[in-house]
Design a protein with these regions (language model features):
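Feature captures the catalytic ectodomains and active-site-proximal regions of enzymes
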Residues: 1-154
Length: 154
């Protein structure tokens, strides 16, 4: 993966944009695996290139979401490329190729929000709250056995 850190990110983005513009779908979920897969190689330059590619692709999606008055949620299930090295007891730099336990971002890009809701994460907020949050943004109530949404509607 470090030999082609862009992977298929642009192709995924192009296909997603085409589907979004088709008007056939209300919801889509995609995975840019670049940071994860390239992070496992321990190649810092490749990881930087991978994440620059993802940044570029996410910006394209944001632009289309704004054009279509949509909502974009950006998150991850774990870190990897965020910590590429650790140090030995002697100070030697050692590649770190495993997942990290670092907190991951959770961003809702909603240019049309109009103060319809507030972000009110519970103290134990985590990945298990994203399904109900997504359902709420789509206009549905989450099942009672789901963890609570991260949103409170006004």
């Amino acid at each position: 993966f470090d030999e082609a850190p862009a992977m298929k990110a642009q192709e995924i983005t192009d296909a997603t944009i085409a589907l979004l513009r088709s008007g056939e779908y209300r919801y889509g979920r995609i995975n840019f695996a670049n940071g994860d897969m390239v992070g496992h190689t321990g190649n810092l330059d490749a990881a930087i290139s991978a994440m620059e590619t993802v940044d570029h692709c996410v910006q394209q999606l944001i632009d289309v979401i704004q054009e279509l008055d949509g909502v974009l949620i950006y998150t991850s299930d774990h870190g990897n490329a965020d910590q590429m090295f650790t140090e030995s007891e002697t100070g030697e730099r050692i590649p770190m190729t495993s997942h990290t336990l670092a907190p991951v971002p959770f961003v809702i890009h909603d240019p049309q929000n109009n103060e319809m809701y507030d972000l009110v994460p519970p103290d134990d907020a985590g990945l298990s709250h994203i399904a109900s949050t997504t359902m709420n943004l789509l206009g549905y109530e989450a099942p009672h056995d789901y963890n609570q949404s991260l949103l409170r509607f006004n």
